């Protein structure tokens, strides 16, 4: 870890900002993250990162948020910009994208509370319920976990309550657990899809939710991931496993996604802050290990960005993956120091991963009407899309992922 930490100091902390978008939002040496006269890094400027997060918020609101079918008291995210005719009427239903936009709306309220943001959260929740058929359930367990988490945060931080929805979703997630493959919940409804896949994207956010609900199933779910889907050599979290007809494990899918690292990190942090001293230490150790694995195996370097920038995973669903990881890296940076000095290097590293990625995303934005437009790979320049292209920059997921990243940076800047 010392090597990675030194590399972070050497290559990330002293990199100057090169892009300006709005007053006092960064020019040469203007982001508060450049080198000072003695080569040390200047403190991050909370006001600047808050302003950048607000610009990302405004851009998503202006380009994507609309009333659902012109219904009063609703809002929802149009899945593409420029939007196709089907997208304009919310034909494609991207349930879990909307859950993450809701989470970002909650982030924005926490950053700068006001009645309009609160009302927007309430309208958005109404839009999700109506578009989903006046119900909360979905075929995919990971989708339901994300909506439950977003609703829970909306209640905790904004005061918009949907307790019946959270209970319904949590109950559905419990029903997804079986002993096949050693435990865990399925990726999607087994009866409908003849499912044989259990993965971290479903079990990770479920463990986070159960931990916040103080449900002991959180421990079982996270332990299942640790026992079956963490590389013992690198600490990287794998994707999932296939369950054989006899209930054994037929195959482990060892593909690595930023998404999986983020949700397992989040689960470890929740359990570390919940359990007794011994349990807390164990889960904090796993969280620190995951941060180190991310820095070592899931970052990129390019001419357009310094190292320690989180790896992009394309558009569509992949547009959210790195943003999810950034959310929980920010939590790691703030939480791990509570468990002693041995966790300070991992907390430092988590901070650097968030800020390096946020600087790169900001630097590589594309000019667009009504605010910055971000690409799916923050280490590369974004491109302005047209309606007749499949450019990932069109996707709401990609823009929400970058917004999530900038909210994480704004949170760290005001709390560190």
Residue ranges and their predicted role:
Residues 263-275, 283-299:
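Oxyanion-binding "anion nests"
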Residues 206-210, 214-268:
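Active-site cradle of extracellular carbohydrate-active enzymes
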Residues 204-205, 258-270, 291, 321-324, ...:
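Aromatic- and acid-rich polysaccharide-binding/catalytic face
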Residues 116, 120, 161, 165, ...:
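Alpha-helical positions within canonical tetratricopeptide repeat
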Residues 1-41, 416:
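Actinobacteria-biased recognition of intrinsically disordered, low-complexity terminal regions
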Residues 167-197:
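Asp-box/WD-like beta-propeller blade repeats and closely related beta-sheet repeat scaffolds
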Residues 13-14, 39-99, 111-146, 154-158, ...:
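CBM-like carbohydrate-recognition segments
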């Amino acid at each position: 870890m010392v090597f990675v930490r030194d590399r972070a100091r050497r290559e990330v902390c002293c990199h100057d900002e090169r892009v300006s978008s709005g007053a006092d939002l960064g020019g040469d040496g203007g982001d508060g993250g450049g080198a000072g006269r003695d080569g040390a890094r200047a403190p991050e400027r909370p006001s600047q990162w808050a302003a950048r997060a607000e610009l990302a918020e405004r851009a998503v609101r202006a380009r994507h948020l609309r009333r659902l079918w012109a219904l009063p008291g609703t809002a929802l995210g149009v899945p593409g910009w420029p939007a196709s005719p089907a997208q304009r009427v919310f034909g494609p239903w991207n349930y879990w994208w909307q859950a993450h936009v809701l989470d970002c709306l909650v982030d924005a309220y926490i950053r700068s509370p006001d009645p309009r943001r609160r009302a927007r959260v309430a309208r958005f929740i109404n839009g999700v319920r109506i578009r989903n058929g006046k119900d909360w359930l979905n075929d995919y367990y990971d989708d339901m976990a994300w909506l439950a988490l977003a609703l829970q945060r909306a209640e905790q931080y904004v005061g918009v309550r949907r307790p019946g929805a959270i209970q319904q979703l949590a109950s559905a997630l419990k029903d997804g657990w079986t002993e096949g493959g050693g435990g865990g919940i399925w990726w999607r409804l087994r009866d409908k899809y003849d499912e044989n896949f259990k993965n971290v994207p479903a079990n990770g956010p479920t463990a986070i939710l159960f931990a916040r609900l103080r449900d002991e199933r959180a421990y079982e779910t996270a332990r299942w991931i640790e026992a079956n889907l963490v590389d013992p050599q690198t600490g990287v979290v794998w994707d999932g496993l296939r369950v054989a007809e006899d209930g054994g494990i037929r195959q482990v899918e060892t593909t690595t996604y930023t998404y999986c690292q983020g949700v397992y990190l989040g689960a470890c942090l929740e359990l570390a802050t919940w359990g007794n001293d011994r349990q807390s230490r164990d889960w904090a150790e796993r969280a620190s290990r995951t941060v180190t694995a991310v820095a070592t195996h899931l970052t990129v370097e390019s001419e357009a960005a310094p190292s320690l920038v989180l790896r992009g995973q394309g558009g569509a669903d992949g547009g959210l993956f790195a943003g999810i990881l950034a959310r929980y890296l920010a939590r790691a940076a703030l939480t791990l120091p509570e468990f002693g000095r041995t966790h300070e290097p991992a907390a430092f590293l988590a901070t650097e991963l968030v800020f390096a990625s946020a600087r790169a995303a900001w630097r590589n934005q594309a000019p667009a009407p009504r605010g910055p437009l971000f690409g799916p790979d923050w280490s590369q320049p974004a491109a302005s899309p047209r309606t007749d292209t499949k450019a990932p920059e069109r996707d709401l997921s990609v823009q929400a992922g970058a917004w999530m990243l900038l909210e994480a940076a704004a949170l760290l800047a005001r709390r560190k």
